[in-house]
Amino acid sequence: MAIKSFADDVTSAVFDGECPKGFPAELQSATRRKLRMVDAAHELRDLKVPPNNKLHPLIDDREGQHAIWVNDKYRICFRWQDGDAYDVEFTDYHS
């Protein structure tokens, strides 16, 4: 399993198929699909496909993390280490 830890209970719940209170219901399916991609990845480069993931490294206070797009506003952010994802979170890190 590639996901070793979640940054918060909301992201963990979405991964488990739940729709937590306050979570945008219209994004649940896409978010869960993206989380499953992270979980299935054996190498970071696996997340370059499909291209609309827009895998990219983060900078500044999120240096050491990577992100993939859920939509124009939201991202799945995580730290990648030795083939596993840590501190996985669904977030709008621009706000």
Language-model segments: which ranges?
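Intrinsically disordered, low-complexity boundary segments flanking structured domains
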Residues: M1-A2, P24, H42-R45, L55-H56, ...
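Glycine-rich, flexible loop/turn motifs
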Residues: A2, V10, C19, E43, ...
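A short, surface-exposed loop/turn module that caps and links secondary-structure elements
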Residues: H42-H66
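Conserved phosphate-interacting/catalytic interface
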Residues: V38
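Enriched for short, Lys/Arg-rich terminal
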Residues: L58-I59, H66-S95
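Generic structural signal for well-ordered secondary structure
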Residues: K4, Q28-T31, L47-P51, W69-N71
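Arg/Lys-rich, positively charged N-terminal/basic patches that mediate binding to nucleic acids
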Residues: M1-K34
